Amino acid sequence: MASNPEERNSDKQKALDNAISQIEKAFGKGAIMKLKQNPVEKIDTISTGSIALDSALGVGGLPKGRIIEIFGPESSGKTTLALHVIAEAQKKGGSCAFIDAEHALDVLYARKLGVSTDDLVISQPDTGEQALHIVEYLVCSGAVDVIVIDSVAALTPRAEIEGDMGDQHMGLQARLLSHGLRKLTSAVSKANCILIFINQIRMKIGVVYGNPETTTGGNALKFYTSVRLDIRKVGVIKDKENITGNETRVKVVKNKVAPPFREAKFDIMYNEGISKLGEIIDMGAKLGVLEKAGAYYSYNNTRLGQGRENVKTYLKTNKEVANEIETKIRDLLRNHDNSIIIDEDSEQLLEESVF
């Protein structure tokens, strides 16, 4: 028997190496390894289409090989955000799929957001089981970069569809998702694919204190997701009397790849999607790329206009200036690990969650 610590450590190391060798023989090379043999690389991401949200996520976008949940009230921009992710993936040459469980995808609107619908794989499954089987085939193919499921609430179990209208089916959907996610999690990681679940909000009955809101599909999705995004409409954008868009806020309520509880605010314009020009103005002013004096904005000692909407009009007609400002903003974010902007609301949310 070894008498000193060094000999005991040597024996333990030999035993560990022997165990690793046996595991590799049983399950194949790469089934187990030390981290120094496979050093951690920078997380590969796909942009959300929003500079502010990419910054709030801390890694420059949605991480590949992970499961993502986007949830919020009706007409808050959930599908719009998911379509922007698809458009960004396609710009990089990626393949994408849209599982339209709600049977409500607006193809014309998707095109306006920059989605190449000719290259988009679309499925409209009849049951929740069929939807998850289709997702499993797509993920295991290794050929798809982004898969969007719209929505969790529409993943109706076969037993519920085949039953009578008034039948009670307690927990069927939650069990379906729990079983499906157990199978999909490792496959998504191996395929380096992003699997996005769009989810709806429901109200808990009888909640007096605390938040009565909850998401559909049980608790399994909350555990298996690496990133959860809470998207809300916080205001409207008007052009004189007409409403032309929504002011939108996204909270990163869960993040396994960077610090959570950050926020991003941006505009979603009708028939246009996320307003990149609005983000350029807001983030440019925050980062000091644009100079703001009262309601006036300036860039390189050149006055761009008075008021945010007038500056957006100027940048729309002067795309070279807009591209130059955007490049400077992204360079600043990249040099600070994409995570230098946390507004006061995010700091307060972080403090509440910690303390």
From Swiss-Prot:
Gene name as annotated: recA
Cellular component GO terms, alphabetical: cytosol
UniProt: ATP binding residues: G72, P73, E74, S75, S76, G77, K78, T79
GO terms for biological process, alphabetical: DNA recombination; DNA repair; SOS response
Entry's family note: Belongs to the RecA family.
NCBIfam families attached to this UniProt entry: tigrfam_recA (TIGR02012)
Organism name: Wolbachia pipientis wMel
SMART domains: AAA (SM00382)
Functional summary from the UniProt entry: Can catalyze the hydrolysis of ATP in the presence of single-stranded DNA, the ATP-dependent uptake of single-stranded DNA by duplex DNA, and the ATP-dependent hybridization of homologous single-stranded DNAs. It interacts with LexA causing its activation and leading to its autocatalytic cleavage.
Annotated protein name in UniProt: Protein RecA
Keyword set includes Cytoplasm: yes
Lineage: superkingdom: Bacteria
Keyword field contains Coiled coil: no
Cited CDD domains: RecA
Alphabetical UniProt keywords: ATP-binding, Cytoplasm, DNA damage, DNA recombination, DNA repair, DNA-binding, Nucleotide-binding, SOS response
Localization, UniProt: Cytoplasm
